């Protein structure tokens, strides 16, 4: 299990845990970051990551990406 920030570009895996307080977790779950969901790191642009989750590309900050654990 690693935080999304440590996954190299092109890595595909499965979200295993979303960390943070209940408001943060709810916000991320509303965006599609749910345990058991497949995720792929598409690119890293400065302080942001672009990921593919549920067939949607989403840009998230490094701070947010640290809260998402994947295997």
Spell out what each predicted region is.
Residues 1-71:
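Compact, glycine-rich, soluble single-domain proteins
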């Amino acid at each position: 299990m690693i935080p999304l920030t440590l996954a190299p570009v092109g890595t595909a895996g499965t979200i295993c845990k979303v960390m943070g307080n209940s408001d943060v977790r709810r916000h991320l779950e509303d965006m599609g970051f749910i345990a058991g969901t497949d995720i792929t790191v598409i690119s890293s642009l400065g302080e942001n990551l672009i990921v593919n989750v549920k067939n949607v590309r989403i840009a998230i900050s490094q701070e947010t990406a640290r809260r998402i654990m994947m295997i």
